[in-house]
Amino acid sequence: MKFYKNLLVELALMASPLAAIPVSAVSWSYPTDPIQRLPFDSGEGTINAPYVITNAQQLADLSWYVNTGRTYEGAYFVLGNDIELNPGFTFEKDGTYKGEGSPKQWVPIGSGEKSVFKAHFDGCNHKITGIYQDSLVVVKDTYPSEGMHSYMGLFGYVANDTLCNITIANSLIKLNCNIEGIEDVSISVGALAGSANNSVVYNCVNEANVGIYSDSRSGCGNSFLGGLVGDMYISYEKSVNISDCHNTGAISTDLKETSTGGLFGNINGDFKMSNCSNNGDISGTWLAAGLVGETWTYVVEKTGLENLQNLGNILGNGSVAGILASNGGYISHATNCVNKGNVTSTADNSYSGGLFGQFIGGDIINCHNEGEVYGGSGIVEY
């Protein structure tokens, strides 16, 4: 599905005075005072004439508008260019960076339940590079439990939308959950979105390294970490499709009680996932897997896993697996799934397997494991 017309986008870009300016040359800042300028270059926000974002400042302005209460519910956005947020910086796999000075901190689009992005966002196969986050944005929310929460990524908190055709590259999200004066904070982190509720996600790629850590290993609540999305909640009456999504970044955490996945940390609700893969190394604690750390499903007919592949090495001290670490509920089937990475659990008692740590309900068809499994079994442990 594409919700834009190529001709309209091309015409909008031709008319834009910024279209010929290299994106890396456009400076940006997150607004600190009320602004009047629009967070897009052209468009009407409709499916046939979407809002077109062409530079980093417009993307930052969109974040400001959403975080001050505008949801853009039902509107359509597209990218008209690759967007570079920190030109001149290179972000390394070891969590360091190279460049002059310090990179600019990205403020996520949608900070929580009261500041939610509800529009459709199509990257049109463009890249967003240079996302850098090392400090949490903390709000008081009720999901997944009442208390202090932080939603980090390009988007923080999104709902009832579509995120598609976006690649996150040359970026670094490395967060410390210890904040002075806050005893307990629950964190949802993904390079694309921290939390995506009732949202369709397809053709999205993460190449960034994403991690959450603690200096003291205390003060951090139940958290969700994914290469693309930290956690997704899906209403009981719905089912969403996730397809053609891939991760190559290293995803890691030392926090206790964290669900970690190469694509999604946690999915709560019915979904179908197809044609997705992970090629990054995953290091977690409680639940860790190549694609999804944990799922909670309701209606078996609305669920399914097809054509999934893990190539990364998975390490954890709880339930660990190449595809899915733990499933609460039922999944109708898993078809054509393969794990080629090594799976290691350091826990004495855990559900760990080459493909699935825990798989309840349906059929496993034409799935196989080619990686070494330490602390579990070949395809499914339980």
Q: What are these model-predicted stretches?
A:
Residues 1-26:
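Sec-dependent, cleavable N-terminal signal peptides
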Residues 24-382:
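Surface-exposed repetitive/solenoidal architectures
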